[in-house]
From Swiss-Prot:
GO terms for molecular function: rRNA binding; structural constituent of ribosome. Belongs to the bacterial ribosomal protein bL9 family. One of its GO terms (cellular component) is ribonucleoprotein complex. It comes from the Bacteria. Binds to the 23S rRNA. It holds the Pfam family Ribosomal_L9_C. The keyword Membrane does not apply. Keywords: Ribonucleoprotein, Ribosomal protein, RNA-binding, rRNA-binding. It comes from Stenotrophomonas maltophilia (strain R551-3). PROSITE patterns: RIBOSOMAL_L9. This is Large ribosomal subunit protein bL9.
Amino acid sequence: MQLILLQKVTNLGNLGDLVDVKPGYGRNFLVPQGKAVPATESNKAEFEAKRADYEAKAQAIHADADARKAKLEGASVTIAANASTEGKLYGSVGAREIADAFTAAGLELNKSEVILGEGAFRNIGEYDVLVHLHADVETTVKVVVEAEKA
């Protein structure tokens, strides 16, 4: 299935690229999310006519991601969780808890932007977490998981 990308998509292409993808990926993800349109002649002509608008929108999104990166750079948050005396958590601290903690601290962060390479944290300690704000914008934040005070 051939598509025209309306924004940069990680591991696929940039704005305006003509890409071949599997039909399910295009039909169920890229097109409904507004990231691409089918590569018909009319869509190609319409895209070329509106190319400047799409590029301006992409620049604005990238600038917003850069501004958020500047706020998050070097940020740290502490999460208290129920833990045993050995330091093992009775549950886990995942992307949702991390995003909620940063949002509560005044730094907006979505669950989908938090990348936990090795899965949720199951022990108390200090962790570096990758935050993927845009296809080109990533930063690292510090998360401290500590035992709840009884």
